[in-house]
Amino acid sequence: MNKKLLFPLALVPLAVTSLQAQKSAQTQRVDKRPNIILFMVDDMGWQDTSLPFWTQKTDYNKLYETPNMERLAKQGMMFTQAYASSISSPTRCSLITGTNAARHRVTNWTLQKNTKTDRKDKVLDVPDWNYNGVSQVPGTNNTFVGTSFVQLLKDNGYHTIHCGKAHFGAIDTPGEDPHHWGFEVNIAGHAAGGLASYLGEENYGHNKDGKPISLMAVPGLEKYWGTETFVTEALTLEAIKALNKAKKYNQPFYLYMSQYAIHVPLDKDKRFYDKYKKKGMTDHEAAYATLIEGMDKSLGCLLYTSPSPR
């Protein structure tokens, strides 16, 4: 093909053939672009897994069961000295814009517009920071403006899916909506960084009239209200549906799977609770362990059931 393209004018009758070959080659290049799944876990400690992130297993590694993390590590690469901010918003704002917290200056968690979330300190004065989060467009005070890599993927032919926790911008700012960042599909993502409830029986933080009981109510999962479906599982089911739908499109996909787990509250996932109680854990310890294993099960479901890499 390259030889034909080097001499496009040498043989006029071959021009159509050359163009067809070029178009075919472009299609093949598109087909070779990989599908991408980025799996984000919230508030997870480096020892809160059965996969050691040190030279040997720690006592905490022996408590938890995350077989799918182990499987993924064997198939790929581990970064045992990587850094993430200790608070949700800075990490997620860094991820979406490609800038570190020292640059975007979202140094604490965001929620309500023009409202700082710092605790008062008797000694230290907290410097001004971007408490409205990040955005792709100017016009909002105390906001870092940056380009989303998701938008770049979308602009280059990717089908983009957001599932779970967003937490990029404060309420009533452009950045609160995952669509603003280039996601074509948004499942349960909004401004809040936490959740009111993991439980379908509690409508994930909505009352019987369908109204949220707090700003932390998880949106968009009404079909699971009143069921025993843990929110981690509900998000996984919806992500798989979105991926199966994406199979019909002649384009690669990007899925940002951002579980609310393991953020508080420590609601127990009944599927795994008894196992950890038998290990001698307290109620809170066992509930925390179930959040971890539920997250790992979600990872396994995506590894086993997502469309094959392109």
Sequence positions of predicted segments:
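Bacterial Sec-dependent N-terminal signal peptides
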Residues: 1-31
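Loop/turn elements at helix/coil->beta-strand transitions in domains of secreted/extracellular proteins
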Residues: 33-36, 75-80, 156-160, 249-255
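Formylglycine-dependent
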Residues: 111-159, 166-253, 259-268, 277, ...
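Active-site-proximal N-terminal segment of extracellular/periplasmic enzymes that hydrolyze or transfer
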Residues: 24-77, 166
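Catalytic metal-binding/acid-base residues of hydrolase active sites
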Residues: 44-45, 100-101, 166-167, 260
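Short, solvent-exposed loop/turn and secondary-structure capping segments
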Residues: 47-53, 84, 91-94, 105-108, ...
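Short, structured active-site-proximal loop/turn typified by the sulfatase FGly-forming signature C/S-X-P-X-R
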Residues: 57-92, 98-103, 159-161, 181-190
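Conserved small/polar residues in nucleotide/adenosyl-binding loops
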Residues: 304-309
